[in-house]
Amino acid sequence: MSSPLADEPVEPADEGAEPLTDDEYAEYLAELGPVWEVVDDHHLEATYEFDDFADALAFTNEIGELAEAEGHHPDLHLSWGEVGVEMWSHDIGGLHESDFVMAARMDRIYDGDGGD
């Protein structure tokens, strides 16, 4: 079952906003799947595993569609049986609530709970 965070809107950071503090992002991180971690207090990283390249590619394409629809784009790394994801808000140079919303939506797609 996916996190309720996946149902929240993806909203850009307000002009002049500061990245989330570690206390602030810890609450959001707890709502994500176990593949996610915060790296250097700066960005989210996850590696999703698949049985083959075709499944990894299909997942990558679904994430691409999500990113285009929301206007918030992760860095994606596709390889055989894996998709690596890095997510952060470039405008503020760190993490924003919307990064965690996107991560929760990626978990939802991976779990098959509403990727369309």
Swiss-Prot record:
Catalyzed reactions per annotation: (4aS,6R)-4a-hydroxy-L-erythro-5,6,7,8-tetrahydrobiopterin = (6R)-L-erythro-6,7-dihydrobiopterin + H2O
The keyword Lyase is annotated on this UniProt entry: yes
Domain of life: Archaea
Swiss-Prot/TrEMBL keywords: Lyase
Top EC class for this record: lyase
Signal peptide span: none
Cited SUPFAM superfamilies: PCD-like (SSF55248)
Protein name, entry field: Putative pterin-4-alpha-carbinolamine dehydratase
Source organism of this protein record: Halorubrum lacusprofundi (strain ATCC 49239 / DSM 5036 / JCM 8891 / ACAM 34)
